[in-house]
């Protein structure tokens, strides 16, 4: 899992059927920017928890994704 900050969103006018209804966010992890499927209603500026890889795909009903926002972080003990 990774912690990051939502810095934008991605709008797709056409996408695969299995991605219909998914909202995508751009998340800065401090090392790279990732596009992640939003599962919790996060917004720009929110600190979020991401899951990546196969787990993200399984979390989203096996959609072809490799990152998903699974929590909005209120506090993380002062660590990035």
Report residues per predicted region.
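N-terminal first-folded block
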Residues: 1-26
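Short beta-strand-to-turn element immediately C-terminal to the catalytic PLP-Schiff-base lysine
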Residues: 27-28, 51
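C-terminal structural segments of small proteins and small subunits
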Residues: 49-80
């Amino acid at each position: 899992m990774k912690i990051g900050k939502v810095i934008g969103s991605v709008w797709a006018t056409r996408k695969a059927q299995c991605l219909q209804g998914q909202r995508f966010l751009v998340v800065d992890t401090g090392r790279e920017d990732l596009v992640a499927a939003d599962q919790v209603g996060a917004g720009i500026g929110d600190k979020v928890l991401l899951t990546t890889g196969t787990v993200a795909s399984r979390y989203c009903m096996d959609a072809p994704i490799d990152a998903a926002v699974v929590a909005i972080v209120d506090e993380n003990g002062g660590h990035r």
